[in-house]
Design a protein with these regions (language model features):
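Membrane-integrated ABC transporters
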Residues: 1-40, 47, 55-67, 84-88, ...
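Short intracellular "coupling" helices and adjacent cytoplasmic loop segments at the cytosolic face
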Residues: 3-7, 57, 93, 101-125, ...
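Alpha-helical segments in transporter systems
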Residues: 24-45, 66, 70, 85-89, ...
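Hydrophobic/aromatic residues in alpha-helical transmembrane segments
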Residues: 43, 47, 84, 88, ...
Length: 585
């Protein structure tokens, strides 16, 4: 228990440095709220004086002066409150802006393993909802952490100066109300934590369903997905209802205690007035102080609730910061080889998986060769790409790449040697030029861009666009067809010169003729580049020097197209299923 408390304290301290640069606002916000509270505490005393002294004596001049003073306090209080809100908001927004900036930078530096563990949907929620919750909590804290206690305890002190005997009722009421607030807070904390987890689950499901909507419809899984989403949504609803039921008890319980105290104060006050120990104005002042305490305790209830949610959000964010960032300067074990790619008895299992995704894979590729990779769904093709780009490291065996017989010295150098065109063609809003030079710091000439477009078989449609290289690209490349997007992403990879080029099923939207021209151009123009093409089509791999056949993580073959066709039953079955006419012949 103590260890957990120390961990939470360390986590909160880790986020406190974001107040740096906003120290003035952090001090002035609560300070102005303190002034506002002081002005409010004077109002009941002024009203009591009007009732007890001015009205009985019909002193109009004095009455006008007191009413004017009340208006002055109201105007000054409004100005002070607005000023306090400005400073509090500035500190909260500034804090969150820097926090969000650093959190985004941290997320971008996480390893693939950590991103998979935290999940994309959870990271999005932490970057948006959690940071906003922290901003709300800070804003409310700076506005209320001095104001509410000052008014509560100030009202008790002022009540004591009026009637020490009746102050006991005030103290008893405050103790009971604090007990209600903190009991509810203790009950609500774990529920709010579960609500955050339920939110992550819904966001993750929504993201998956939107991205895979075509597949879901194609396989008739719409009803099943709707049922799964409804179940997750119901869990979220149940948690919100449970939290709502508990939090809704706070207000009626508070009013019950306060109104009970109010009846007691009025009853005792009436007796005190009858004995001549208390005036009517003083009783009115006591009632006003009682209502002020009620208002501030309700605000404190909201503050405690907001802070609890903020602490939960802060905990989720610090979990991200506690992850080690990927260090591109990490030194790798050096080795030498005549091959460009050497895989020796490699086995890899994902951290959350029970079975290996790749098991005992063994092959080697010469520099400038064309390696084809084929296999069914779940065979391990995408896993191989993640290992080739060093997003993961195999638990057994080894995988190494070489240039001029030497392996890369650092993780950053390894990544710079490998260009990957992913399955999903991603284009960003901007221009064709801005997409082609994405991530490249050195200046790239137009000739180099056109050469990459020529090789990728994209120069024909780019030249027809208005503005050509400076033609507009909409978000996600929506103004291009699937095949055009794939060719542009391949061209982008070619602009960033590297000795290895991996096409992860990134020619699937191209017709056979265009694909053949593209692969031929890469072979002719980039003779030193080692090409790895992952494809579902055997026709795409005919020209490959070697083809790696995978099935459920196991290597079933490693040979040329013709050799596999003669020797491997699985490859032959795949090929003939795609070319029925050859089988019949």
């Amino acid at each position: 228990m103590r260890a957990n408390a120390l961990l939470e304290k360390r986590r909160m301290k880790a986020l406190s440095h974001y107040f740096k640069g906003y120290l003035k606002e952090t001090i002035l916000g609560p300070l102005f709220k303190l002034f506002e509270a002081s002005f409010e505490l004077l109002v009941p005393i002024i009203i009591a004086r009007i009732v007890d002294t001015i009205i009985p004596h019909h002193d109009k001049n004095h009455l006008y002066m007191m009413v004017g003073l009340l208006f002055l306090l109201a105007i000054v209080g409004m100005f002070v409150a607005i000023t306090a809100q400005y400073f509090s908001s500035k500190a909260a927004v500034g804090y969150t802006r820097q926090l969000t900036k650093d959190l985004f930078k941290k997320i971008m530096g996480l390893s693939k393993e950590d991103r998979d563990q935290l999940t994309t949907s959870s990271l999005v929620t932490r970057l948006t909802s959690d940071t906003y919750q922290i901003q709300t909590g800070i804003n409310q804290f700076l506005r209320l952490f001095l104001r509410a206690p000052i008014i509560v305890f100030g009202a008790i002190i002022m009540a004591f100066t009026i009637s020490p005997k009746m102050t006991i009722d005030f103290l008893l009421m405050v103790v009971i109300l604090f007990a209600i607030v903190f009991t509810m807070s203790h009950l609500l904390n774990p529920i709010y934590a579960k609500i955050r987890q339920a939110t992550d689950r819904i966001v993750n499901m929504t993201r998956q369903q939107l991205e895979g909507v075509r597949v879901i419809r194609a396989f008739g899984q719409v009803a099943a997905e709707e049922q799964e989403f409804a179940a997750a949504n119901q869990d979220y609803t149940d948690l919100q209802i449970k939290a709502g039921h508990l939090s809704s008890l706070v207000t009626p319980l508070t009013y019950l205690v306060v109104n009970g105290t109010l009846i007691l104060v009025i009853w005792q006050g009436n007796l005190e007035i009858g004995r001549g120990l208390l005036s009517q104005g003083m009783l009115i002042a006591l009632v006003n102080y009682l209502l002020q305490i009620l208002t501030e305790l309700l605000k404190m209830t909201m503050l405690v609730t907001s802070l609890n949610q903020s602490f939960i959000s802060a905990k989720r964010i610090t979990e991200v910061f506690e992850k080690d960032s990927e260090n591109l300067a990490t030194e790798l074990i050096q080795s030498e080889s005549a091959f460009a790619l050497a895989v020796k008895d490699m086995t890899f299992t994902y951290p959350t998986a029970a079975e290996p995704s790749l098991s005992h894979i063994d092959f080697s590729v010469n520099a400038g060769d064309f390696l084809g990779v084929i296999g069914g769904t779940g065979s391990g093709k995408s896993t191989l790409v993640e290992l080739l780009t060093h997003l993961y490291t195999p638990q057994e065996g080894s995988l190494a790449i070489f240039q001029n017989q030497h392996s890369p010295k650092t993780l950053g150098e390894w990544r710079s040697w490998v260009n990957v065109v992913p399955q999903k063609a991603e284009l960003f809003q901007g221009t064709i030029r801005s997409n082609l030079i994405l991530g490249i710091r050195d200046e790239v000439s137009d000739n180099e861009l056109w050469r990459a477009l020529d090789i990728a078989q994209a120069s024909d449609f780019v030249s027809e666009k208005e503005g050509q290289l400076d033609a507009k690209v909409e978000a996600f490349g929506r103004n291009f067809s699937g095949g055009q997007r794939q060719r542009l992403t391949i061209a982008r990879a070619l602009v960033r010169k590297a000795p290895f080029l991996i096409l992860d099923d990134s020619t699937s939207a191209l017709d056979y003729l265009t694909e053949a021209k593209l692969l031929s151009a890469i072979h002719e123009e980039l003779k030193e580049v080692t090409l790895v093409l992952i494809s579902q089509r055997t026709n795409s791999l005919k020209a490959a020097d070697k083809i790696l056949l995978l099935d459920r993580g196991h290597q079933l073959g490693f040979a040329s197209h013709d050799e596999l066709l003669k020797q491997n039953d699985v490859y032959r079955a795949i090929h003939y299923s795609q070319h029925q006419e050859e089988k019949e012949a």
